[in-house]
Amino acid sequence: MKKKVIDFIKENSMIKNGDKVLVALSGGPDSVCLLHILSELRELLHIEVYAAHVNHCLRGESALKDEAYVEELCKNLNIKCFVKRVDINKISEEQNISTEMAGREERYKFFEELKNEYSLDKIAIAHNANDQAETLIMRALRGTGIEGLVGIKPVRDGIFIRPILILRRKEIEEYCEINNLNPRIDETNLEEIYSRNKIRLKAIPFIEENFNPDIVATLNRLAYSCSKDVEFIQEEVEKRFPKLCIKENHSILIKEEAFNEKEALLTRIIKKALFEVSSKHNNFELKHIQDIIALKDKGTGKQINITNGVIALNEYGDIRIKLVDSKKAKENKVLNLENIKDELDKNQKVVIEDDILGNYELIVEDLKKGEKFSKDRFIKSFDYDKISNIDIRFRQNGDKIIPLGMKSSKKLKDIFINNKIPKEERDFIPLVLFNNEIAWIVGSNVSETFKVTNKTKKVIKITFKGKEN
């Protein structure tokens, strides 16, 4: 089995002579097997081996026993072990994320700290062939594309390596038994409350019994095949990207001609632009890419919010992807009515254009008897004579509005929650303020304070043109 692992390490260029390798050690069979194998191969591979264990403080006495076990194991193997205790429940609540996500982030943060402090070269993670099969099934059920079917990569970012991805769970358990390693068992892995556990404990055994007894190996071959296809496609993207995109001023301009490319290439060029602008690889979905493709035909000046503060703007058929500096945008008062009052009184119309907050058309007119107002959520009318100045900005801490029909104010945060506005979009919804009071959450609520009444003589109609209806 060691030869199998050595061959896999060499095939994927995981380790070179002199590398310092940190093993992520939970104390379970997979990580214990990985640590023991690398320990046995230290001299052959000319490497130094270290271990890191994070106690999530989630499982009480069991977690303490895990911690004691890994320390004793490392002592017996003469491997330096780093241990850290983290209150994952507390972090999960503070950051409003799952304990699973909080645990993963804290582990990788710890690994990164150790890597920098001790000049480590590689971080070894104990994913195995069964993990790969489970990952592919989960992603297929969610409707993944070919990139998703690549699954868990043997090497990521040249740092994270998975030397036992080639081994099945049964092989790992047998190895631990033969070598009297007595790994710890996380009882939560046996509970059918998580999707992955259901796939591991129910779906795969059912498929093995009724359809394909070698489904784990089959899915691993699929992952390998998809990885080769993705490599080829990505090479084409890297070749075409410099010809179809221009990097400038902290943004990327996707040329109009890019939209004539095959969809398989175009979608990946857009995805690459999004990643390069935002430096975040996990929060872009197919819908975001489709929205950008649709924006191409909406006309110049049109703009959409993507996510993570990223916007896309149509510039005469080209599409600019840029990251909004929300702090700067919040400080930027785009329009002050005192400066344009003469123009409004003279021409009754003013156009405001801003590449962060969008484009607006302001029209002042007399209120006609029986006039019906637009139901378009991006066109709103207000009592002009109640207004002395106008500001347009994004939200700030403590913002409130008196919603139409109400007497008391409500926090914007509560309104966004009630309207089911995604968290990542809330900081980038423009707000129109009259007299330093929020009058309109663009695309949504208007204020009771500035509503048109039977006493209104003049109305100001504001049309927001920077977001699609």
From Swiss-Prot:
Keyword match Nucleotide-binding: yes
GO cellular component: cytoplasm
Enzyme's top EC category: ligase
Keywords, sorted A to Z: ATP-binding, Cytoplasm, Ligase, Nucleotide-binding, tRNA processing
A family per Pfam: TilS_C
One BP annotation, GO: tRNA modification
Highest taxon listed in the record's lineage: Bacteria
InterPro entries in alphabetical order: Lysidine-tRNA-synth_C, Rossmann-like_a/b/a_fold, TilS/TtcA_N, tRNA_Ile_lys_synt, tRNA_Ile_lys_synt_N
Binding site for ATP: S26, G27, G28, P29, D30, S31
Molecular function as annotated in GO: ATP binding; tRNA(Ile)-lysidine synthase activity
UniProt catalytic activity: cytidine(34) in tRNA(Ile2) + L-lysine + ATP = lysidine(34) in tRNA(Ile2) + AMP + diphosphate + H(+)
UniProt-listed CDD domains: TilS_N
HAMAP family: tRNA_Ile_lys_synt
Family statement drawn from the similarity comment of this UniProt entry: Belongs to the tRNA(Ile)-lysidine synthase family.
Task of the protein: Ligates lysine onto the cytidine present at position 34 of the AUA codon-specific tRNA(Ile) that contains the anticodon CAU, in an ATP-dependent manner. Cytidine is converted to lysidine, thus changing the amino acid specificity of the tRNA from methionine to isoleucine.
Description of its domains: The N-terminal region contains the highly conserved SGGXDS motif, predicted to be a P-loop motif involved in ATP binding.
Protein's name in the database: tRNA(Ile)-lysidine synthase
Lineage summary: Bacteria, Bacillati, Bacillota, Clostridia, Eubacteriales
